[in-house]
Amino acid sequence: MTESWVVIFTSTRTSQDADGYRAMAAQMEALAHAQPGFISMQSVRGDDGVGITVCYWESEQSIAAWKRNVDHASAQQQGISTWYSDYSVTIAKVERQYGKRNSLFK
C-alpha cells in the first residue's frame, strides 16, 4: 500500500433545500475526483439524515489544496448555514488497510 490520508466527514442533514443539496453533493464529488492527489470516495446517508463520507488522498498537501478550492469552500459555507445541523471532520494518516472488497466500495 502506498502512503495515503483519509478525510472522514460525518454530518446530520437538515430538511432544508434537499434538491440543492443533492446537486451540490454531486458537483463536489465530481470536483474532488478531478483534484490532484485524489484516490477514492465513499458516502452513505441513513434515513435519519446522518451521513458519512470517507475520502482518500495521497498526501496532507492534497487535502489542504482541496480545502482551499474556492468551489469547495463555497459549498462548505452553504452546508454550515443551510444543509447540516451538525458535522465533524477527521483527518488521519492511513497506517494499515485490509479487508474483503465488495460491491459497496466499487
Enumerate the language-model features and the residues they cover.
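Short S/T/G/P-rich N-terminal loop/turn motif that feeds into the first structured element of a domain
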Residues: 1-51, 60-68, 84-106
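Short arginine-rich
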Residues: 76-79, 83-86
